[in-house]
Amino acid sequence: MADSFHFSIDIISRGKGKSAVASAAYISGEKIKNEWDGITHDYTRKERVLHKEILLPKNIPKEFKDRSYLWNLVELNEKASNSQLARQFIIALPKELSIEENKKLIEDFINTNLVKEGMIVDYAIHDESQKGNENIHAHLLCIMRPINEKGEWQAKSKKEYILDEKGEKILNKNGKPKT
């Protein structure tokens, strides 16, 4: 099977000079204007975007499938200069599988672990190798705030600590509470 594996998670944050709209334009190979700062991000020349899609929880309005609408709404909803806008995953996919098999694999992961938990996920499958299927990977962008069935933003979820049978926080090896 795979001779190497990569799985990384990062936060798209204004405090780091990042933009959810720019990230969405990049992963999808699209041109999207950021209504927060007026900058247009054009990645239409990006090649080898094999598939792109937005997956929604069942009760979320269908307009959230529009990439520009979704990520501009995120940008406009978060007011702070250091706002956390999205979670970003980059996941290597097995080059031995076909594009359709990889699509099914990543969608199963997304639906089981993210959409089922109420997250909207914008994802794309890329292959940046010249030979084809040598560097196949998926980019996932997930919203940070839940949205209700009316399309209204909810509060960001707080950390939930793992407690022992006495209700005390369980500490990890660094002495910090486990979440």
Positions of PLM-derived features:
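N-terminal nicking endonuclease/strand-transfer module with a His-rich metal-binding environment
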Residues: 1-179
